[in-house]
C-alpha cells in the first residue's frame, strides 16, 4: 500500500509541475493581468567589445543569429595550452547580444520587466540605447525594470557580457547561458520573489 501511495503522490506532483510549466508560457492571467513571454528566440550575437552596439541605429545585420540559452565559448577552438579546469575553451572575453521586438500599446499603466536566469558575466542591459540595469555576477538570476525605457512599437534590447574580470575553478560558460522572459503586469502587483510560506514549526 505504501508503494501505491508513493506512486500516486509522485504522479500528482508531476501533474502540478506540468500545470505550472504551461501557465508560465500562457497569455495574461484574467485574475492578475500578468503576462509572461518567452524571450529566447531571435537574438543576434557578436563577440568583441564593439562600440555603440547598444544604440538603436547600430547595424547588426552581419551578427550571428542565436537562440537562448547560448554559450559563445563552446564554439571553440580548444586551446591545449589552457588549463583543463575551464575546459580549454575560450570563455574569456566580451560579447554582445541584440534583439529587436515590437510592443503593442498596453492600454494602461503597466510595468515591463526582463528576467534573466543567468548571464556570464557582469552583464549590462540596454533598452533602446539606455542603460536599464546591470548585474555584478554571473551565476544568479536578476530582474531589469524596463518600464521607463520601453515604448510602443519597435524596441531594441542589447546585452553586454564581460567575462574578463571573472575568476573560476571550473568551466563557467560565457554569454546569456540561461533563459530570458519578459513580464508585463499591472502597476500594482506582487513583486518578484515577494511570496513566502512560513510555519510555526
Task: Walk through the language-model features, giving the residues of each.
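Bacterial N-terminal signal peptides
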Residues: 8-21
